[in-house]
Amino acid sequence: MVVVAAAPSAASAAPKVLLLSGQPASGGRALPLMVPGPRAAGSEASGTPQARKRQRLTHLSPEEKALRRKLKNRVAAQTARDRKKARMSELEQQVVDLEEENQKLQLENQLLREKTHGLVIENQELRTRLGMNALVTEEVSEAESKGNGVRLVAGSAESAALRLRAPLQQVQAQLSPPQNIFPWILTLLPLQILSLISFWAFWTSWTLSCFSNVLPQSLLIWRNSQRSTQKDLVPYQPPFLCQWGPHQPSWKPLMNSFVLTMYTPSL
């Protein structure tokens, strides 16, 4: 049996649907065939794409609709499973990378702890060699108490002591020369002070003797120069002023004589 559902109009782009079934619908399933319908002449001439409309499934039976829905659900579920699997694989790779990085950091932390322990031992030995008391701070004790969870490699203290033997010998060799030089410094320091005192006394006496020889000569020269300047002075002669004349507005002989006596220098 063949059922043909034609398009409502020739100009519409909806395809024709042909349902081919050899038996009735209850006995078997129909196979839908999608046949493209003729396009409109105006749309071919213009070449503009038309908006795709959602296909209506009014021509399908309920069984066909349910089958189509099941297929869509299967495809969606498969894509979701693939996406979830890819995400899980990515997360697993991240976990592996983080575990490797954590192991590297733990190893580095352990090596740093060993190094600090060796440095503490070296510091204590140097303090004991210098005659100072080994200082055990509270921070070191707290760090050791907190670090009990992390196990140190056995024999780390022994290896640190073996590594520190050669540096300690070098430090001892470097510290021994100053200890030998210290008595020499104590003996040479007073001699140096005495030499400085004697040099200072000699310098002061020499400068005083030089100035004592130079000062009288300079005083004599200064006195001679003062005397020569006093001898070479020209006596001051006041200008001649007429006590009475047409240039005087009034007669003041006493005031004029007083002015003359004030300006005449004493010879």
From Swiss-Prot:
GO terms for biological process: adipose tissue development; angiogenesis; cellular response to amino acid stimulus; cellular response to antibiotic; cellular response to fluid shear stress; cellular response to glucose starvation; cellular response to interleukin-4; cellular response to laminar fluid shear stress. PROSITE patterns: BZIP, BZIP_BASIC. Isoform 1 N-terminus domain is necessary for nuclear localization targeting. Isoform 1 C-terminus domain confers localization to the cytoplasm and is sufficient to impose rapid degradation. Isoform 1 N-terminus and C-terminus regions are necessary for DNA-binding and weak transcriptional activity, respectively. Signal peptide: none annotated. Residues 35-60 are annotated as: Disordered. The record marks I185, L186 as: Cleavage. The lineage of its organism: Eukaryota, Metazoa, Chordata, Craniata, Vertebrata. It comes from Rattus norvegicus (Rat). Functions as a transcription factor during endoplasmic reticulum (ER) stress by regulating the unfolded protein response (UPR). Required for cardiac myogenesis and hepatogenesis during embryonic development, and the development of secretory tissues such as exocrine pancreas and salivary gland. Involved in terminal differentiation of B lymphocytes to plasma cells and production of immunoglobulins. Modulates the cellular response to ER stress in a PIK3R-dependent manner. Binds to the cis-acting X box present in the promoter regions of major histocompatibility complex class II genes. This is X-box-binding protein 1. The chain crosses the membrane at residues 181-198. Residues 69-85 are annotated as: Nuclear localization signal (NLS). Residues 91-126 are annotated as: Leucine-zipper. InterPro entries: bZIP, bZIP_sf, ER_Stress-Reg_TF. The gene is Xbp1. The modification Phosphoserine is found at S61. Gene3D superfamilies: 1.20.5.170. Keywords: Acetylation, Activator, Angiogenesis, Apoptosis, Cleavage on pair of basic residues, Cytoplasm, Developmental protein, Differentiation, DNA-binding, Endoplasmic reticulum, Membrane, Myogenesis, Nucleus, Phosphoprotein, Signal-anchor, Stress response, Transcription, Transcription regulation, Transmembrane, Transmembrane helix, Ubl conjugation, Unfolded protein response. Isoform 1 interacts with HM13. Isoform 1 interacts with RNF139; the interaction induces ubiquitination and degradation of isoform 1. Isoform 1 interacts (via luminal domain) with DERL1; the interaction obviates the need for ectodomain shedding prior HM13/SPP-mediated XBP1 isoform 1 cleavage. Isoform 1 interacts with HDAC3 and AKT1; the interactions occur in endothelial cell (EC) under disturbed flow. Isoform 1 interacts with the oncoprotein FOS. Interacts with SIRT1. Residues 199-267 are lumenal.
